[in-house]
Amino acid sequence: VVQITALLGAVLFGALQGRLGGRLTYALTLLLWIAAILAIYFVEPMTASLNARLGLALHAEQVFLFAGLLSGLSLGSSQSVGRALVGMFAPESRAAELFGFWGLFSKLAAIFGIFGVGLLQWLFGLQGAVLFCILLFALALLPLLAIDEARGVATARRADEGARAGV
């Protein structure tokens, strides 16, 4: 199910990126991740609230499935929009190099993220570790504030023109 919603997230946010731009769309994917993690964290209170307010008889597992669907949308959208941003900012002549760095740092982030979550789970329990993930996604929003998307694309184009001219 997560793979299907990840595909859906990649397609939907790809279309959204064409309208809103890469930076804003990437910020939205990070906010979607935060919402998904909050949904996971608050599954039991959300289940109780939905049951009480709407007269439903949901089980926590059903609400958790919804949180999993949000996670899938988040996964597919953030990966596709992130790669598209790298592609926009990478001069064609250096695209392989920059995508190589992208891949390396993605793998390092996964390693340190798992280590951090594992350490925090050991120290504070699973729920504390889940909240750590929210912190990581919130921190990822900060560098986006300084990115000038038009300037990045223009710089990549100038670098390509310089490479073609032999500069």
Where in the sequence are the language-model features?
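A membrane-interface helix-boundary motif in multi-pass transporters
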Residues: L54-H59, L119-F137
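C-terminal ends and interior cores of transmembrane alpha-helices
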Residues: L31-A57
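Helix-to-loop junctions at the C-terminal end of transmembrane segments
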Residues: L8-G22, Q121
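Loop-to-transmembrane helix entry/capping segments in MFS-fold secondary transporters
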Residues: E92-W102
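Residue-level signature of mid-helix packing/kink "hotspots" within the transmembrane helices
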Residues: Q3-V11, A110-I111
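Multi-pass alpha-helical transporter architecture, strongest
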Residues: V43, L131-V167
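Intracellular juxtamembrane helix-capping segments at the cytosolic ends
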Residues: S77-A90
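Hydrophobic core of transmembrane alpha-helices in multi-pass small-molecule transporters
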Residues: N51-S77
